[in-house]
Amino acid sequence: MLCRRRRVGAAVRWLSRLAPPAPAEADPVVVRVDGSNVARLGKPKPGPRPRQLLSLPPFPGGGDGDPLPGRKAAAPRRVTAVSWVKHYLADVPQEVVQAHFNKRLVYSECSDHEVSVETIKSQKHHLKKIKHNDVMEPGMRIHLPVSVAEGEIKKRYETIPTATLHPNKDEIEYLRRLVIHKDSAILVLNKPPKVPMKGNLPVHNSMDVLAAAALSYGNEEGPKLVHRLDRESSGLLLFGRTKESFTRLHWLFTSVNLAKTNSQVWNAACEAYMQRYWALVIGTPKEREGIISAPLSKVLLDDGKAERVILAHPSGIDGAQEAVTAYRVMGPTIHGCSWIELRPLTGRKHQLRVHCAEALGTPIVGDYKYGWFVHQRWKQNPQPDFEPFTGEPYKLRRPEGLEIQKGSVLSKVPLLHLHCREMVIPNIAKFLSSNGEWHENGAPWSKEKPNLLRFIAPMPAHMKISWNIMSSYLV
């Protein structure tokens, strides 16, 4: 009985992150010869330690839980081993995780597999090597070397419900509180910062997956993203609830001319389409307002593992895309920063961030990808602020009762200050019947409905604090 307990204890220590204890018996004394040919007595050098493995929670599977309210039971989702590992090791570079799979250092263990005490003594009998594209099965557990983490591991166990990969009840309620408009054709919500737009399985806390699960409101299919915002930015986000509304609004956000039809009413509504962003930038543009027409192109970095958007070469031989942005300075320069209003006339990736940083020379506060060096100079060399009309200096003061939110302009590491505040779009529900039929001049029963919809989203907490701080100064 005592021998059996020792064997089980040894197996548990093998799977732990701690090294096994040193043997109780005394180590033999050996003779060592150093570089000076001097013989010394001492303990032998320690040999290689047994590989320490990190164990991830068992895979829950996606088809066992009850379907969400208003949704039909979905088929189990296909999740690969590399996706499951990347989800829990969010802070580890993807190439490090993939390298461990390539070296065949990742093992799998099925929880319902019967393993005897004698088998536990040799881990090779119930741990098998797996590939990155192997499909996870319910109850499967993954083991991989602790070295993959290279330090503290950020565990995200709380983001995955125990029995399903769908959002939990709290996430559904939180997302529905963000909705500011809902009709038969569209959904509009105020996206908070730091929420990704799209995520690969099993990462379910992205806007597309959350909305599809939580904002269906009884429809067989969830709403689909019409456009995108950057992960760090915030503001108005538009979803199409039907295939027809999603398609036509997606054309509108791509090009106004692409969305036009033979209907004068619909075309006039498309011409009125508009988006307005508010941003806090470092410095002040030379002109108070204007239009930026600077084509953009993408370049690949780190052997294709990352990409960056830059201003295109004037020759246009690098696959440039047209990008046009209208801007207006909203006030004086305070604390070395200025509030500006941005109107994108085209929809390119990182268009506003690149135009502010490279075309205007005033990167957005918190945009470390395109304004890292300007942020360094801004923090290290604070300059006095001057009233642009009188030329007199002034200083910041903190209003009474105002709490400094982490991420505001006075924070050591400010968050991105880019917010989609206003949006004007056609009232597409007026042109669609209940069965999805398109009416060029509007459905007969919807003549009293307006042709346009206008939405305004309040700023997130860190931008509100920055706004209040910068609007409170002494002359």
UniProtKB/Swiss-Prot annotation:
The keyword Isomerase applies. GO terms for biological process: enzyme-directed rRNA pseudouridine synthesis. It comes from the Eukaryota. One of its GO terms (cellular component) is mitochondrion. It is found in: Mitochondrion. One of its GO terms (molecular function) is pseudouridine synthase activity. Residues 90-160 form the S4 RNA-binding domain. Transmembrane segments: none annotated. Keywords: Isomerase, Mitochondrion, RNA-binding, Transit peptide. This is RNA pseudouridine synthase 3, mitochondrial. It comes from Oryza sativa subsp. japonica.
